């Protein structure tokens, strides 16, 4: 499992991804939106 946190419109948001494929898809989407802050940790 992977925990991902980012800031969108001044608000901190987070999600937990079950597997690495879901994690990679979420990160790709977040980076394409060019958020300034994205952090992730493996749980």
UniProtKB/Swiss-Prot annotation:
<protein>
    <recommendedName>
        <fullName>SPbeta prophage-derived uncharacterized protein YopG</fullName>
    </recommendedName>
</protein>
